[in-house]
């Protein structure tokens, strides 16, 4: 028997076919969220205050400093925040110190800075009662980047860009004549030498002395420069030129130019490279990173002893560079100090490191390599040394020295996680607040003012609220199942503020890059316009302090070439320097390689190389893919397009009533379920004392009792049912981090997205055509694929001009039968079964006072009370929303609930539906093999096996060959073996069961060796002609259910302006009869059908009502009138100043009557407006989902009587 037994958690053992030993545990899968937020709370927030403070007033009299901050206890717990539609947040208090420099007086005060949203343990935020996830963003890293493009003659043109975190961009470029230019902040270009002169190096000799006189592009640029032979101060002239480019039309002076350039580049408040920008810039420009492979044109000696380190003519190898590195790190080695002229922007001396080498393109030419000195990582702004060194790099590229950058390389793209995104948002708020504080400082009396009076927290609160509420990266959490949650938290988006837009992103950005290996999943990405822009973090990847993605590798000892268990995490640009063996390379027990030649990766190349060259080895075969992709068994046998669909569709699997973990899994299911946040996890070790459906109590070793409350029938974001079930028994010992209770889509601690039905690949009466699925009625009867869905509905009683709305049982014109499940307040009881149109909350709204008729006056005189003028505005069950009332929540002002202004009472009703699998539901396996149910076949009619077992699902064999997802067949056969042997299997991706293992397992289970069997037709008892592949496969029911999609309308709401029916199920709209459908009717000459579609059934408002009357009264249907949209068109053309008239056959003008001029009793504009006013409350529910044009849900009075 191949394989070995492995325990997953305490409750599940599987036979695993993996051959590679796990040297590294999977990390906590949501640490990208939690670590980033913790950093923000501990360091990021303080950094922000230190950046903005101290704030000084314009006269320098007052100074406001930051001392400390603290977060107090949150107002609500996580569950309370969810229930009250509130935020899970804690009050932020900041201690500020105000110093009066004139009197020396110091005032300290604690200032409230608003409520700050807290992250839950699951890595989410609760905003307005809904769980949200902040998606990490993938952006270009700040730094300096060089690019190369060939012109039409095939000559290389180089360009460079300095990208800051915030501030002005600096770009270099050469034109067709090889003259170099610079652009500041995307303005017009100016010769590069003008920038050098503005930095204080005014004469041509200084420039040639610094950069070397042999550079062709430099001499051409100097020739082009207008100040070439100017006698007066060239520095000032250059400054004026730059000012003219940046501020055209304004009077130019050297002083204004200096202050403008200082503000643009050298003011830390305006220009920020961030630590990562400084790190990247130093890595690109420092001398020690640029010498490798160059031929020295001077002898290098130790400055202290004079010992020769390298001779002129030596080529710098790795060994020589290692020897030189300690010297290159010194401040006094090959360092030249240049002093700019006094008119320069920055007058401090500039220290550069400079070494002469020979040009690669012309080995007789000597060119300098200039490094930017030793600028510490704390310097977040650009320095003149950076600009000069980057210009030198630019000139050197034309000599063949240095390399251009690939912007899609993950060394040049970084992750902005929650913490940094929040920090940036907070910075915006604080910067707005700073302006207000400065203004208040100058207005208020300095002797009496306190910090509290200066601070206005509104901009800070608003920017945080805006970020959580409406940022593109703050998303409503995908809560279909635990895998969907987990993947959402690990998602990386290139979209969003400061990122790309869908329309501008080309193929290169979206494509898989070799640096994605072990960092971003090459498989899991959406289909459609976002493909390649939204990615998923690989399973072992982590994000370092600079925001670059790292992936772990096992170090290979360079002495004896053995693989050690020492793990190094490498970023993409570090990895480029190493050769890395694959995880499945055969090893001996002592860690040495079995073969002398092994397959390895060198950048984007796969090579076979000697063991001596190997630096690292992969940690695990699954480090390449994300968690969802790693859940697909036999992934290596599937075509990547189908694997992509498989990974995406697992996230859409609906939690079933009684799920089963897959018989054939990959072994990552336990970790995925554990880290997703839906399971109940033990915090500390102990012994289980009590278990029921609602709570588990664990006695800790020190005697304290921990009570874990389980989640019961909670509605998730996606309207699914989230429920926890205990899996531990009384007396059982649990360790910290053990699973105590399964969440939704879990079984025995493992992810269980679907079921393991018996599947045959066969055709059946054409019901398999085009990916359709024929299923056994047993799956319906036994609730195998039954799921519970919970929908919530709200009704608010508001204060109106005519008096308050009232929740009551006494609703006008409603029979007792409709009120049978309502209590005295008109609210439905929990447990009642409701159907479409039933009342959930009885509510009446006061109507306007009207003139009383004689009869009403008589009644009023007799009974002394006016018959109540109210309208029925009850909340009713919408179409397709019937079910069992699962919960009712009532919020009132008296109970201290926070309600929006004008609302007295709010009732929320939860309706649970039990949905069995039915025709039209979408199902899928894990290999992208999706289809819809086409027929439910009675159990007795299904094909059955020789032992009488009927098949559960029949799939079309045509769905396999062309799609090349062969993994489903291997899963089918191994699943059959597991089913017959009564065990669970694990076959990890890229390291799972081989073909031989699968057939050995089939043979061991006693099933025919080819995995096929004779099936008998359930209707005739005859055997089918050929043997059929039968087995067990994990099959899911997806969230695309026919109940949510089916929709029908006779009459309903119309759009206000065009009077055409609305569209879409959410608005109870009609089916659009579009341009092409009209052509089809025209082709048949179906004139009358076409006419009624364009008039009665659409926007002929008068005709609609008359037609309705005629049908009711059994009369012939009248002639149609003029469609409203035609009138709209005429009015729009008239608004353009065109004289539009409608003429008849005799060229006589037809007067189009307005709707309210019609003599018949029809619905006119005023009636519609009044009706809309009355029904506003009714239609509040639709407003959220209403994605159409500005619509008003108005239904004609008469039409609505039915």
UniProtKB/Swiss-Prot annotation:
The RNAP catalytic core consists of 2 alpha, 1 beta, 1 beta' and 1 omega subunit. When a sigma factor is associated with the core the holoenzyme is formed, which can initiate transcription. The keyword Transmembrane helix does not apply. Keywords: DNA-directed RNA polymerase, Nucleotidyltransferase, Transcription, Transferase. Pfam families: RNA_pol_Rpb2_1, RNA_pol_Rpb2_2, RNA_pol_Rpb2_3, RNA_pol_Rpb2_45, RNA_pol_Rpb2_6, RNA_pol_Rpb2_7. GO terms for cellular component: DNA-directed RNA polymerase complex. This is DNA-directed RNA polymerase subunit beta. Gene3D superfamilies: 2.40.50.100, 2.40.50.150, 3.90.1100.10, DNA-directed RNA polymerase, beta subunit, external 1 domain, DNA-directed RNA polymerase, subunit 2, domain 6, RNA polymerase alpha subunit dimerisation domain, RNA polymerase Rpb2, domain 2. InterPro entries: DNA-dir_RNA_pol_bsu_ext_1_sf, DNA-dir_RNA_pol_bsu_external_1, DNA-dir_RNA_pol_su2, DNA-dir_RNAP_su2_dom, DNA-dir_RNAP_su2_hyb_sf, RNA_pol_bsu_bac, RNA_pol_bsu_CS, RNA_pol_bsu_protrusion. GO terms for biological process: DNA-templated transcription. NCBIfam families: PRK00405.1, rpoB. It is an enzyme of class 2 (transferase). The gene is rpoB. It catalyses: RNA(n) + a ribonucleoside 5'-triphosphate = RNA(n+1) + diphosphate. Residues 1171-1188 have a biased composition (Basic and acidic residues). Residues 1154-1202 are annotated as: Disordered. Its EC number is 2.7.7.6. GO terms for molecular function: DNA binding; DNA-directed RNA polymerase activity; ribonucleoside binding. Belongs to the RNA polymerase beta chain family. It comes from the Bacteria. DNA-dependent RNA polymerase catalyzes the transcription of DNA into RNA using the four ribonucleoside triphosphates as substrates.
């Amino acid at each position: 028997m191949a394989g070995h037994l492995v325990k997953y958690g305490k409750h599940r053992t599987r036979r695993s076919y993996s051959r590679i030993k796990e040297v590294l545990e999977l990390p906590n899968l949501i640490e990208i969220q939690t670590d980033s937020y913790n950093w923000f709370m501990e360091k990021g927030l303080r950094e922000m205050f230190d950046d903005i403070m101290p704030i000084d007033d314009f006269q320098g009299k007052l100074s406001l400093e930051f001392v400390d901050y603290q977060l107090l206890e949150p107002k609500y717990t996580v569950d309370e925040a969810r229930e009250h539609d509130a935020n899970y947040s804690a009050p932020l208090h900041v201690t500020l110190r105000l110093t009066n420099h004139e009197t020396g007086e110091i005032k300290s005060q604690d200032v409230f800075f608003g409520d700050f949203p807290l992250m839950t343990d699951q890595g989410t935020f609760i905003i307005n009662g809904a769980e949200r996830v902040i998606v990490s963003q993938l952006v270009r890293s700040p730094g300096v980047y060089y690019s190369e493009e060939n012109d039409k003659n095939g000559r290389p043109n180089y360009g460079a860009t300095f990208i800051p975190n915030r501030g002005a961009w600096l770009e270099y470029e050469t034109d067709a004549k090889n003259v170099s230019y610079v652009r500041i902040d995307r303005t017009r270009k100016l010769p590069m030498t003008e920038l050098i002169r503005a930095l204080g190096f005014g004469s041509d000799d200084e420039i040639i002395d610094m950069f070397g006189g042999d550079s062709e592009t430099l001499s051409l640029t100097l020739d082009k420069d207008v100040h070439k032979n100017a006698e007066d101060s060239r520095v000032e002239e250059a400054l004026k030129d730059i000012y003219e480019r940046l501020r055209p039309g304004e009077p130019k002076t050297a002083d204004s130019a200096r202050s403008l350039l200082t503000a643009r580049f050298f003011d830390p408040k305006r220009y920020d490279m961030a630590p990562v920008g400084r790190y990247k810039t130093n890595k690109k420009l420092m001398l020690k990173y640029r010498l490798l492979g160059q031929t020295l044109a001077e002898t290098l000696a130790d400055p202290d002893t004079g010992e020769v380190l390298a001779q002129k003519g030596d080529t710098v190898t790795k060994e020589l560079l290692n020897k030189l590195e300690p010297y290159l790190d010194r401040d006094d080695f090959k360092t030249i100090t240049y002093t700019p002229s006094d008119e320069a922007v920055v007058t401090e001396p500039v220290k550069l490191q400079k070494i002469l080498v020979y040009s690669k393109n012309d080995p007789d030419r000597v060119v300098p390599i200039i490094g930017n000195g030793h600028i510490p990582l704390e310097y977040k702004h650009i320095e003149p040394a950076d600009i000069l060194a980057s210009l030198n790099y630019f000139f050197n590229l034309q000599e063949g020295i240095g390399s251009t950058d690939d912007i899609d390389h993950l060394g040049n793209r970084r992750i902005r996680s929650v913490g940094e995104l929040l920090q940036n948002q907070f910075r915006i708020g604080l910067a707005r607040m700073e302006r207000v504080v400065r203004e208040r400082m100058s207005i208020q009396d300095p002797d009496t003012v306190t910090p509290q009076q200066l601070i206005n927290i509104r901009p800070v609160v608003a920017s945080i609220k805006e970020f959580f509420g409406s940022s593109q990266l703050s998303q409503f959490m995908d809560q279909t199942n635990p895998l969907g949650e987990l993947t959402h938290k690990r998602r990386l988006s290139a979209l969003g503020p400061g990122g790309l837009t869908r329309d501008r992103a080309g193929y290169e950005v979206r494509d898989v890059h070799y640096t994605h290996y072990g960092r971003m999943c090459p498989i899991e990405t959406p289909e459609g316009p976002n493909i390649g822009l939204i990615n998923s973090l690989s399973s072992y990847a982590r994000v370092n302090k600079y925001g670059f993605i790292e992936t772990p590798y096992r170090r290979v000892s360079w002495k004896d070439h053995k693989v050690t268990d020492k793990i190094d995490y490498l970023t993409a640009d570090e990895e480029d320097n190493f050769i890395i063996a694959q995880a499945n390379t055969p090893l001996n027990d002592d860690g040495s390689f079995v073969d002398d030649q092994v397959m390895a990766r060198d950048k984007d190349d796969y090579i076979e190389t000697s063991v001596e060259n190997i630096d690292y080895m992969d940690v695990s075969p699954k480090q390449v893919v994300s968690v969802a992709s790693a859940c697909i068994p036999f992934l290596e046998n599937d075509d990547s397009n189908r694997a992509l669909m498989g990974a995406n569709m697992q996230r859409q699997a609906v939690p079933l009533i009684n799920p089963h973990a897959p018989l054939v899994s990959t072994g990552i299911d336990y970790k995925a379920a554990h880290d997703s946040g839906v399971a109940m996890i033990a915090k500390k070790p102990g012994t289980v004392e009590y278990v029921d459906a609602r709570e588990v109590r664990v006695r800790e070793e020190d005697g304290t009792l921990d009570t874990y409350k389980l989640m019961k029938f909670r509605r998730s974001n996606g309207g699914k049912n989230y429920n926890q079930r205990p899996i531990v028994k009384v007396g059982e010992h649990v360790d910290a981090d053990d699973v105590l209770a399964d969440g939704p889509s879990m079984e025995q601690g493992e992810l269980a997205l679907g079921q393991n039905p018996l599947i045959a690949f066969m055709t059946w009466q054409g019901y398999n055509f085009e990916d359709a699925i024929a299923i056994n009625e047993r799956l319906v009867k036994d609730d195998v694929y039954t799921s519970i869905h919970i929908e919530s509905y709200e009704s608010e009683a508001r204060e109106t001009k005519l008096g308050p709305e009232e929740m009551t049982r006494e609703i006008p014109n409603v029979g007792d039968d409709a009120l049978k499940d309502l209590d005295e307040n008109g609210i439905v009881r929990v447990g009642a079964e409701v159907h479409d149109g039933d009342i959930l909350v009885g509510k009446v709204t006061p109507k306007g006072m009207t003139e009383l008729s004689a009869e009403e006056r008589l009644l009023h005189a007799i009974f002394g009370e006016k018959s109540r003028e109210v309208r029925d505005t009850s909340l009713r069950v919408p179409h397709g929303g019937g079910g069992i009332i699962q919960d009712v929540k009532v919020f009132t002002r008296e109970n201290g609930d926070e309600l929006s202004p004008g609302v007295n009472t709010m009732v929320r009703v939860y309706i649970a539906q039990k949905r069995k699998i039915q025709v039209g539901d979408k199902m899928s396996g894990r290999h992208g093999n999706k289809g819809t149910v086409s027929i439910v076949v009675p159990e007795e009619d299904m094909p059955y096996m020789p032992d009488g077992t009927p098949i559960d699902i029949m799939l079309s064999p045509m769905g396999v060959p062309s799609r090349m997802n062969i993994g489903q067949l291997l899963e089918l056969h191994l699943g059959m073996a597991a089913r017959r042997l009564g065990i669970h299997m694990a076959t990890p991706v890229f390291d799972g069961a081989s073909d031989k293992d699968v057939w050995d397992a089939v043979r061991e289970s006693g099933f025919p060796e080819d995995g096929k069997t004779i099936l008998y037709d359930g209707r005739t008892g005859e055997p089918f002609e050929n043997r059929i592949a039968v087995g067990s496969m994990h099959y899911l029911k997806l969230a695309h259910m026919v109940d949510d999609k089916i929709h029908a309308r006779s009459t309903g709401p119309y759009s206000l302006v065009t009077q055409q029916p609305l569209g879409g199920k959410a608005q109870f709209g009609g089916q659009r009869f579009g341009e092409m459908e009209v052509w089809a009717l025209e082709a048949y000459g179906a004139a009358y059908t076409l006419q009624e579609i364009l008039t009665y059934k659409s926007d002929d408002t008068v005709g609609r009502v008359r037609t309705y009357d005629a049908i009711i009264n059994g009369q012939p249907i009248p002639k149609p009138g003029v469609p409203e949209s035609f009138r709209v068109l005429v009015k729009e053309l008239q608004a353009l100043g065109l004289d539009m008239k409608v003429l008849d056959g005799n060229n006589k003008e037809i007067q189009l009557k307005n709707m309210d001029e019609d003599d018949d009793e029809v619905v006119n504009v005023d009636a519609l407006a009044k009706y809309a006013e009355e029904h506003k409350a009714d239609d509040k529910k639709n407003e959220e989902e209403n994605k159409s044009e500005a619509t008003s849900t108005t239904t004609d009075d008469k039409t609505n009587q039915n």
